[in-house]
Amino acid sequence: MDLRSRTDDALDMELHAGFDAPEIARAVLTEKTLTGLISSISPLVNRLRDSILIFSDEGLIIHCSLETEQLYIPIPANMFDQYNWTGPRMVVLAATEGRSSLIDAFRHTKDPSTPTRLYFKFTGQPPERSIIQTMVWQRPGDCGPDDQVQCYKQVVKRELACYTMMFPNLTPDISICLKRDQFTRLQRLLKTFGFTTCFILTATDMYIQTAGGGFISFNVSLDINGSKPTPYNLIRSITNSKRILNNVVYGSGSMREFGVLLETHSGFRSAVQNLKLTRDETCYINFYLALTNSPMVGLYIQRSAPVHSFFYATFLSPKDLKEKLTSMQLFANMESVKDEPPLKKRRNLLTKRNEKNTGNKMGGKLPETTWQEGIGIREYCVAPPVDPAGTLDYSELSRESDVICTVK
């Protein structure tokens, strides 16, 4: 349908003409907000076509399974340009009997059909409510380059009357933050090697290992209960300070040595490979260790539409943990020694850096600053501030229990 020269109010009246049921709730996304959501959700659209949408007074959650694992994308109510809600939560399937889906509105396209506005209208009474989704976009008209035609598409769905759903609301015991370059290393690792994924954390390092012996390692600076970071082995090689700092990850929680093995590698691999980070986005790897029989690893992407995913795991036995840790530490130390410059050159580099940055003699220690001691030399290098670790900001959407069950 084409609509020419319509004001917002006139357009709204015409869009909802024919749906005479009284409106009980409403949600609106305009172009500026919608553009950010499309850039965040579009890479996952093909995985989300059969997803479930949950509306409540706290906003919208998009929930789907990814290779048998659970994935959640919360969009809080304050992100909508208009959001009015009354009544209990409403659950609808995104898929329709045809080729359309409620998720199509979040797909990025190269043609002008990318939506500029998105409306959700809710009618009826539970458990027989309906949702009317209206997607509005513009296309070039036939009267010249300045002629723009407003088009719209509507999808109508009924709510699910019976459903069971899980919303994890645990607080992670340990949360590790990865920047974009560090997350790219994880993607390359999972793309190159196959079938199993193992996480090992010590007091100073985090190792991620896959089948075939491939692994990546990071130096960990952990913020415990808001205190200063615990000491870590910052300097493995001083030939390139930028490379050293790129190997440092920051996190929070109660650190202890442990290892977990994911029960399904394919789900974690698919989630990581389908996510792309911008320079302003970060990824948090969360570890849930309170349940000793069923630990979980969580993946949280901090963006306009944050992505939460959870993967069941099992603890490594003390014997396996020791064997894996010994082999990876040995290989990491061999690489460190190979890259280390001669001692005389190393001292010259340290002296120049110390004089330039601090104006103190070698070995000077500035008070009230986060400093870390190098290997075998009395030199201190300043570390970046700790980035507070993310938590499940919208994990309490299920306030009654972890499992929601409504029966008609």
UniProtKB/Swiss-Prot annotation:
Q: Looking at the record's lineage, which domain of life comes first? A: Viruses
The record's subcellular location field reads: Host nucleus
Q: Which GO terms describe its molecular function?
A: DNA binding
- Lipoprotein listed as a keyword: no
Listed under GO cellular component are: host cell nucleus
Summarize the protein's role: Plays an essential role in viral DNA replication by acting as the polymerase accessory subunit. Associates with the viral polymerase to increase its processivity and forms high-affinity direct interactions with DNA. Facilitates the origin-binding protein loading onto DNA thus increasing its ability to assemble into a functional complex capable of unwinding duplex DNA.
The annotated subunit structure for this chain is: Interacts with the DNA polymerase catalytic subunit. Interacts with the origin-binding protein.
Similarity field = Belongs to the herpesviridae DNA polymerase processivity factor family.
Record-given protein name: DNA polymerase processivity factor
Which source organism? Varicella-zoster virus (strain Dumas)
